Amino acid sequence: MGGARDVGWVAAGLVLGAGACYCIYRLTRGPRRGGRRLRPSRSAEDLTEGSYDAILSAEQLEKLLYLLESTDDPIITEKALVTLGNNAAFSTNQAIIRELGGIPIVGSKINSLNQSIKEKALNALNNLSVNVENQTKIKIYVRQVCEDVFADPLNSAVQLAALRLLTNMTVTNDYQHLLSNYITGLLHLLLIGNGSTKVQVLKLLLNLSENPAMTEGLLSAQVDSSFLSLYDGQMANEILLRALTLFQNINNCLRVEGRLANQLPFAKGSLFFLLYGEECAQKMKALACHPDVDVKEKALAIKPKF
């Protein structure tokens, strides 16, 4: 290998920590021009512990992606994904990673049976998805991620990572339709998940609820009657406020479409029957006296719709 190529390989090794650094060293252990070897200016541990805040160059990212694509070592794979994910938080690198063909390389890792690797891949895709152009490439993974959300261990880090990616991918209306067949499953996950899972599912549903094109799909989704427990006065505010906003958004979309909720044909057991039923009306009435001002205002805004 030439001197410039050796530098690139060693730089990539530095990024990945002690284990990956050794791997790269083995690949480049031959002498450089002049018989000298490149010595790292900083410890590899600094680069993987979050104390190294430099943005990687395009050349370093290219070597990192090559290593990620070619290695079978789970430790190196995980370190590479973490490093790529951290660098994907920078807008400049979001474009560079796409242009280097990095999105399919990262995306392939969500198929890993190693839950930690899968989580890190989802986190990296999540950061990359902030870039609108990147979303056009990430969209091919949306349906798989939806399927995996329901198969992943409940309340696990990998499940939350998947939900965060789906939330980012539904900030705009462009890809929300890809989730149409998964709304019932998301509502079920909302009910059985812990507080963190509930909040993340609600963030995702809130994105969908702002789009009039998704309103009918939301209201027709089958959901257990325990959904109304989200509107109990003792529910944590971070959940209660989002659940109320979900209801508000649906009402707003119906108004934009010039439709009345009671004119829409939905089956029993649907979200429609719960939101516009007598039990929910009573809950809104009770929340209108809630001590939290924000909760009270939202409940009062919803109450006249009954």
Swiss-Prot record:
Keywords: Endoplasmic reticulum, Growth regulation, Membrane, Mitochondrion, Mitochondrion outer membrane, Phosphoprotein, Transmembrane, Transmembrane helix
Main localization category: endoplasmic reticulum
Gene3D superfamilies noted in UniProt: Leucine-rich Repeat Variant
Cellular localisation: Endoplasmic reticulum membrane; Mitochondrion outer membrane
Modified residues (Phosphoserine): 43
Superkingdom, taxonomy of origin: Eukaryota
GO cellular component terms given for this protein: endoplasmic reticulum; endoplasmic reticulum membrane; mitochondrial outer membrane; mitochondrion
Membrane topology classification: Single-pass membrane protein
ARM repeats: 101-143
Pfam families reported for this sequence: Arm_2 (PF04826)
Residues with the Phosphothreonine modification: 48
TM helices/strands, residue ranges: 7-29
Quaternary structure, from the entry: Interacts with the DNA-binding domain of p53/TP53.
Protein name in the entry: Armadillo repeat-containing protein 10
Lineage: Eukaryota, Metazoa, Chordata, Craniata, Vertebrata
Gene of this entry: Armc10
